[in-house]
């Protein structure tokens, strides 16, 4: 995985609570098991007026020209609730999002996000509301999420966030479960060398 230390990008304010995984990536688009190709279906039922995805809904926030290059998603509480599909963070990252900021996340979505190098940032309701107000007033203006300093910076606003030290380390170093295992390759090889031939 790519290393994540800091990201500066345009935030898009999705002013909705309890956004579930079926809204993030509807079930009819889950046939693939690879991680790519889901971005075009992100928020399909909200982004499009037709089933084929050829008629954009002009009232949906992601379809507004100023947010076309958004890479940070701002949402309300309980983001990613519903089923445990890992396709949800796949769709978000494939679309181009690097971070999601919300007061709270569904537990499984929260864990899946770290596994897919999508940074879920928890801020208080008050801080999220301040960010919504700032983003609305400064639409299209980039903000910064700094994983090393554990801060979200938007103009004069600067909010600190907490994150599990192990997950933070893995994202900063770009380590998934395979990468973590390979860090111990020497120990693994030494252990294997001690085993009887029939066990190798």
Swiss-Prot record:
Question: From what superkingdom does this record's organism come?
Answer: Bacteria
For this chain, one GO molecular function annotation is:
3-isopropylmalate dehydratase activity
Give the record's pathway: Amino-acid biosynthesis; L-leucine biosynthesis; L-leucine from 3-methyl-2-oxobutanoate: step 2/4
Alphabetized SUPFAM superfamilies for the sequence: LeuD/IlvD-like (SSF52016)
Listed A to Z, the keywords are: Amino-acid biosynthesis, Branched-chain amino acid biosynthesis, Leucine biosynthesis, Lyase
Q: Which InterPro entries match?
A: 3-IsopropMal_deHydase_ssu, Aconitase/3IPM_dehydase_swvl, AconitaseA/IPMdHydase_ssu_swvl, IPMI_Swivel, LeuD
UniProt catalytic activity: (2R,3S)-3-isopropylmalate = (2S)-2-isopropylmalate
Task: Please tell me which top-level EC class this enzyme sits in.
Answer: lyase
Give the PANTHER family listed for this entry.
3-ISOPROPYLMALATE DEHYDRATASE SMALL SUBUNIT (PTHR43345:SF5), 3-ISOPROPYLMALATE DEHYDRATASE SMALL SUBUNIT 2-RELATED-RELATED (PTHR43345)
Task: Please report which protein family the annotation says this sequence is part of.
Answer: Belongs to the LeuD family. LeuD type 1 subfamily.
Q: How does it assemble?
A: Heterodimer of LeuC and LeuD.
Biological function: Catalyzes the isomerization between 2-isopropylmalate and 3-isopropylmalate, via the formation of 2-isopropylmaleate.
What is this protein's name? 3-isopropylmalate dehydratase small subunit
Source organism per UniProt? Proteus mirabilis (strain HI4320)
């Amino acid at each position: 995985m790519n290393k994540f230390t800091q990201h500066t990008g345009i935030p898009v304010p999705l002013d909705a609570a309890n956004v579930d995984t079926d809204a993030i990536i509807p079930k009819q688009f889950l046939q693939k098991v690879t991680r790519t190709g889901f971005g075009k279906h992100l928020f399909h039922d909200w982004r499009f007026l037709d089933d084929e995805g050829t008629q954009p809904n002009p009232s949906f926030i992601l379809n507004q020209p100023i947010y076309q290059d958004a890479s940070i998603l701002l949402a309300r509480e309980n983001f990613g609730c519903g089923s445990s599909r890992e396709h949800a963070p796949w769709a978000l990252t494939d679309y181009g999002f690097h971070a999601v900021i919300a007061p709270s996340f569904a537990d499984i979505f929260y864990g899946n996000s770290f596994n897919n190098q999508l940074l879920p940032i928890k801020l208080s309701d008050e801080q999220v509301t301040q960010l919504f107000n700032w983003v609305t007033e400064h639409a299209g203006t980039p903000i910064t999420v700094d994983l090393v300093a554990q801060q979200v910076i938007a103009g004069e606003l600067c909010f600190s966030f907490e994150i599990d030290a192990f997950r933070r380390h893995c994202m900063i170093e770009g380590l998934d479960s395979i990468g973590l295992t390979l860090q111990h390759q020497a120990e693994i090889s030494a252990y294997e060398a001690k085993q009887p031939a029939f066990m190798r």
